Amino acid sequence: MTQQGAALQNYNNELVKCIEELCQKREELCRQIQEEEDEKQRLQNEVRQLTEKLARVNENLARKIASRNEFDRTIAETEAAYLKILESSQTLLSVLKREAGNLTKATAPDQKSSGGRDS
């Protein structure tokens, strides 16, 4: 019976040792789980902050693109109006030169009658 008692004591010691090892492994796993949950929370906060920042950047970008489009429209309209003014100025200059030429011809002395043959 002593042999059985010794075996039972040995089994009991091994069971206690295995239970202690399992408890240690569980505690280590709990520590790892807590670390990963902390990391998860930190990452979720970063994602939230980055998402908010991205939304602000997108809003600013949309406003700036709209402003740029307004600049483009204004510049295009101004350039078109300026080209019309330039064309009108060119036309006005041509008309003025032609009229000035006509006036010069109309007011010039008659060169045919005073060609110097009468002298």
Curated annotation (Swiss-Prot):
The entry describes its oligomerization and partners as: Self-associates to form fibrils. Also forms dimers as well as monomers. Interacts with SPAST.
Q: Which protein is depicted?
A: Microtubule nucleation factor SSNA1
An example GO CC term for this entry is:
motile cilium
From the record, what ranges are coiled-coil? 13-70
Which PANTHER family does the protein's record reference?
MICROTUBULE NUCLEATION FACTOR SSNA1 (PTHR28661:SF1), SJOEGREN SYNDROME NUCLEAR AUTOANTIGEN 1 (PTHR28661)
At which residues is N-acetylthreonine found? T2
Disulfide bond sites: none
Q: Where is this region: Important for localization to the centrosome?
A: 2-32
Summarizing the function annotation, the protein's role is: Microtubule-binding protein which stabilizes dynamic microtubules by slowing growth and shrinkage at both plus and minus ends and serves as a sensor of microtubule damage, protecting microtubules from the microtubule-severing enzyme SPAST. Induces microtubule branching which is mediated by the formation of long SSNA1 fibrils which guide microtubule protofilaments to split apart from the mother microtubule and form daughter microtubules. Plays a role in axon outgrowth and branching. Required for cell division.
